[in-house]
Amino acid sequence: MQYDVLVVGAGVVGCATAMELGKYSLRAAVIEAGEDVCTGTSKANSAIVHAGFDARPGSLMARFNVEGSHAMPKLCERLQIPFRRCGALVLCFNEADRPGLEELLLRGVKNGVHGLRIVEREELHELEPNVSPEAVAALYAPTSGIVCPFELTCAMAE
């Protein structure tokens, strides 16, 4: 059989690449050294869809985090898999740590993260009642989410 493109690896990147190539009438084959799709690093990742506040401004990671965070709900809907926009909190336990939160906030703003803000103790405990009582503030990133990496990779492979 003849192919236009050979994709090496059936993890999340390989399967996403093959899925995208399918939009262009290209005949793509995916080869995998493991016994099945998503048996390597992809299945063991944290499942976090990052908002983009921690990446260096101007970096590809910053761009891909922000764009991916916006694109993931629609992709998951199309693939009929769950996506949860749960947000993320970066906790601050004392005032000496607050400049770190402010630096992350500035990075996120530069990267184009929507809705990013610092929340104080009262609102933090409303957002997450089980948070440590010692937390005094947090950076809140409402555009962060989670998706099962195994389900995502398998759905893209299909």
Predicted regions and their residues:
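Aromatic/hydrophobic pocket-lining residues that form π-stacking "cages" and hydrophobic walls in ligand
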Residues: 17, 72, 104, 155-156
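Helical element adjacent to the flavin cofactor pocket in flavoenzyme catalytic cores
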Residues: 139-158
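Dinucleotide-binding Rossmann-like beta1-alpha1 core, especially the glycine-rich loop
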Residues: 47-127, 136
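N-terminal Rossmann-like FAD-binding beta1-loop-alpha1 element of flavoenzymes
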Residues: 3-30
